[in-house]
Curated annotation (Swiss-Prot):
This is Chromosomal replication initiator protein DnaA. Residues 1-71 are annotated as: Domain I, interacts with DnaA modulators. HAMAP family: DnaA_bact. Domain I is involved in oligomerization and binding regulators, domain II is flexibile and of varying length in different bacteria, domain III forms the AAA+ region, while domain IV binds dsDNA. Residues 71-112 are annotated as: Domain II.
Length: 454
């Protein structure tokens, strides 16, 4: 294959992968040579080469074989001359020293947009989120750094992003002189990749290490992405060394994020780790009552019958976003048809949402989730083996089956290899004891319960 053929092949790939993927991952690749059935391509960085190898290699190989059927394998490598040409370039910049890090203008930080609705005033506090709210308020005061990082975690729709935005809003109001950078972990990765591709890593490092407060949402996104984790790790350390505040959110506790490097997990756990628990009935009702007052600004004549909000708070229990979305839809529908929001209208308008909220969790689903979580075969967990590595997950699955399904103890026992109901009862009791004594068991139960409810 020739370089001209590679250019034609790239155009075909453009149609397949789309403009953004092509620009980021395919366009920087240059054809090198073919030898012994291996086509070698030159890439600007190891990170880009690894990403392309994992995500586009099969597609590229298919296209390459259309041009050269003898090619059986692809190789992506950084040419040896890249480092040789980039390293000497640094001394030439010594005549134009950069401004000190603390002088970096906020405009260059390009923070992600903040939702104006997500403030502390609009955050409804209840027992499930009171600790997270208190910690967020403390950080938002902008005073001395007392815990670093603040790590907020919880399931979808429990208020992590709301609190993150609220902190950023409050800091900008109280301390306008501070450089506050808020972004998602995905945006961090894309900026990192862009800097690698454009050979502007020093600019990237300077921007991220000049902030006063770094806020990263959904940190689990960088799990499994080695180069991004490494840069995040060094950025984290640099900011902590400068006594700058770091605030992170994730969908689970740092120790439970799969494919996250241990050194990164360790850093994330070294501050205050706070769990946003699933909402209870009282908190959901409070959220609905607050949202109704906001909706009345849009619909001044809004009329809601007694019992409707209580009904919704009972029926939609796992996700606050779904709850708020249901209320928004209901108010809009009632306004359009000119009707009072009563139980009949609510059930007609939200029939699909209410059906989805009735999804039944099965024993079999629980067994699969638990076996995956503990990395054991399902057949071993429900089989006769009594090794601790199988017995404890089995008891966890029995406990969750008892708590999250309507199955009786004998029915649960039959689904665990025909075990007697007393065995199930013993397993449930044992886990109830362990979740008080063993923090890891309690965390496993919470993580599994969330995964099953999502």
């Amino acid at each position: 294959m020739t370089k001209e053929q590679w250019g034609q092949l790239q155009q075909r790939l453009l149609k397949t992968v789309g403009q953004n993927n092509y620009k980021n991952w395919i366009e920087p690749i240059e054809f090198g040579s073919t030898q012994d059935g291996v086509a070698t391509f030159e890439v600007p960085t190891n990170f880009l080469g690894n990403y392309v190898s994992q995500n586009f290699a099969d597609l590229i190989l298919h296209e390459v074989r259309q041009e050269d059927p003898a090619v059986r394998r692809l190789r992506f490598a950084v040419p040896s001359h890249v480092n040789a040409t980039t390293k000497p370039a640094r001394p030439a910049q010594a005549t134009a020293p950069r401004a000190p890090a603390e002088k970096t203008p906020r405009s260059t930080l390009s923070t992600a947009p903040l939702d104006a609705r997500f403030t502390f005033d609009n955050f409804i506090v209840g027992k499930p989120n009171e600790l997270a709210h208190a910690a967020a308020k403390r950080v938002a005061e902008g005073g001395p750094v007392t815990f670093n990082p603040l790590f907020l975690y919880g399931g979808v729709g429990l208020g992590k992003t709301h609190l993150m935005h609220a902190i950023a809003h409050e800091l900008r109001l109280r301390r306008p002189e501070m450089n506050v950078l808020y972004l998602s972990a995905e945006q961090f990765m894309y900026r990192f990749v862009q800097a690698l591709r454009d050979r502007k890593m020093m600019d990237f490092k300077e921007i991220f290490r000049s902030v006063d407060v770094l806020m990263v949402d959904d940190v689990q996104f960088i799990a499994g992405k080695g180069s991004t984790q490494e840069e995040f790790f060094h950025t984290f350390n640099a900011l902590v060394d400068q006594n700058k505040q770091i605030i992170i959110s994730g969908d689970r506790a740092p120790g439970e994020i799969k494919d996250m490097e241990e050194r990164v997990k360790s850093r994330l756990q070294c501050g205050l780790v706070v769990d946003l628990h699933p909402t209870d009935y009282e908190l959901r009702l409070g959220i609905l009552q607050s949202k109704v007052e906001q909706q009345r600004k849009n619909y001044p004549g809004l009329d809601i019958s007694d019992g409707v909000l209580e009904f919704l708070a009972h029926r939609i229990s796992t996700n606050v976003r779904v709850l708020e979305g249901a209320l928004t839809r209901l108010c809009a529908f009632a306004s359009l048809v000119g009707r009072e929001i009563d139980m009949e209208l609510t059930q007609d308008c939200l029939s699909d949402v209410l059906r989805a909220s009735e999804r039944k969790i099965t024993v079999e689903e629980i067994q699969r989730k638990v076996s995956d979580h503990y990395n054991i075969r399902l057949s071993d967990m429900i089989g006769p083996k009594r090794l601790r590595s199988y017995a404890r997950p089995r008891q966890v699955a029995m406990y969750l089956s008892k708590k999250m399904t309507s199955r009786s103890l004998p029915e649960i026992g039959r689904r665990f290899g025909g075990r007697d109901h007393t065995t199930v009862m013993h397993g449930v009791k044992r886990i109830e004891e362990l979740k008080i004594q063993d923090g890891q068991i309690a965390e496993d139960l919470e993580l599994l319960r969330r995964a099953l409810e999502e």
